[in-house]
Regions:
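Sec/Tat signal peptide C-region and signal peptidase I cleavage site
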Residues: 7-11
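Active-site histidine-anchored catalytic micro-motif
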Residues: 12-284, 288, 292, 297, ...
Length: 350
């Protein structure tokens, strides 16, 4: 091997390592033609879904398999029309198993680009701005963590379908107590506001916030079956999900509502039943951060609108054939997952 060949090979290896690899090649769609076909199916399957009149500034998205949750993803993404998106993702057990317990920090990555079905996805300059401004004990940088985690990549094909030039700031949120979330969200919102002001970015037009979350993971595989494992248990558990959403996350989003959300979905030392939402920390931390960004940049307040709630047992498998998409888990009364999509917009503070 010549020196020039060796240098070229090394450069190719470095370049490939700087692009985040796809974690889930089964549950999500990474082929442009297949994504186009899937979106056409969803459009036909959801003829009454139209863009909403309000300009969204933030949202909560499902991150489960597309063949299960496609109808729940679909109503949201046509309403996201910004240049860049901050994505608050989960730190799943698979990450903690590999890296050990992670808490009280945000996890950022160091990749130059992420993969998408329509080409590589650029990283927003905001990520490096956050690294330069946030105290070092508030975050870690781990490509390994981001390469294992699937909750952020799940959103990229839908984002990229509507905007081929989308830029992202991927942020994994770890477990942390409320006082830590308050402190860290104060710091992060100040940094985001400084960045947005320096770039003259407007909420909902130039920059957007997306929270990745799946609702209750129910059944014996999750050690989570307080109502039993039959049709009535499924009814009670899904009704509880919807109750929490309508009570805590719809209409005006106040600080009191964010704290009530935390009481309803975060585990504590008591023996009360807490539904197993895997995006519980991203939801609470994300809403804290977003509400503080809104408070500084606008006289309006945040309002939430539910697009759709469903679950694997209700939706079952979408009849989309001849694609590379598949399922990463089975469903039954002993194993199902709830999900929802919701948008947040600004409204007058009356």
């Amino acid at each position: 091997m010549t020196l020039s060949t060796s240098i070229s090979t090394f450069a190719q290896i470095q370049d490939s390592e700087s692009i985040r690899p796809i974690r889930d090649s089964i549950g999500f769609c990474w082929n442009a033609e297949e994504m186009n076909y899937f979106m056409k199916f969803l459009s036909t399957n959801n003829p009454d879904v139209k863009p909403i009149p309000q300009k969204l500034v933030a949202a909560i998205s499902v991150h489960d398999d597309y063949l299960y949750a496609g109808n729940v993803y679909y109503p949201l993404y046509q309403n996201i029309k910004t240049k860049e998106v901050v994505i608050f993702g989960v730190t799943h057990g698979s990450v903690r198993k590999e890296l050990g317990p992670q808490s009280n920090v945000l996890i950022l990555d160091d990749y130059t680009k992420w993969q998408g079905p329509y080409g590589e996805v650029e990283i927003s300059p905001l990520r490096e701005f956050i690294k330069s401004k946030l105290p070092k004990d508030n975050f870690i940088v781990s490509n390994k963590a981001h390469s294992i985690e699937h909750s952020i990549e799940a959103l990229i094909p839908f984002l990229q379908y509507y905007n081929r030039d989308i830029k992202i700031t991927p942020i994994m949120v770890t477990q942390m107590p409320m006082e830590k979330m308050e402190d860290l969200s104060n710091r992060l919102s100040d940094i985001i506001n400084e960045y947005a002001k320096s770039k003259n970015l407007k909420l909902g037009e130039d920059i957007f916030f997306l929270i990745s979350n799946d609702a209750n993971h129910y059944g014996e595989d999750f050690s989570n079956s307080p109502y039993g494992m039959d049709a009535n248990a499924h009814k009670l558990a899904t009704e509880n999900d919807v109750r929490i959403i309508n009570q805590d996350l719809v209409n005006k989003i106040s600080n009191e509502k964010i704290y009530q959300t935390a009481k309803d979905i975060l585990p504590d030392s008591s023996n009360k039943f807490t539904p197993l939402w895997c995006g519980r920390y991203p939801i609470v931390f994300g809403l804290m951060t977003i509400s503080k960004v809104v408070k500084v940049t606008d006289d309006n307040v945040l309002f939430g609108k539910l697009f759709k709630y469903s679950d694997t047992f209700t939706e079952k498998v979408l009849p989309v054939k001849n694609t590379s998409m598949g399922l990463t888990a089975v469903f039954s009364y002993k194993h199902w997952c709830g999900w929802f999509t919701e948008g947040f917009f600004l409204n007058k503070n009356n």
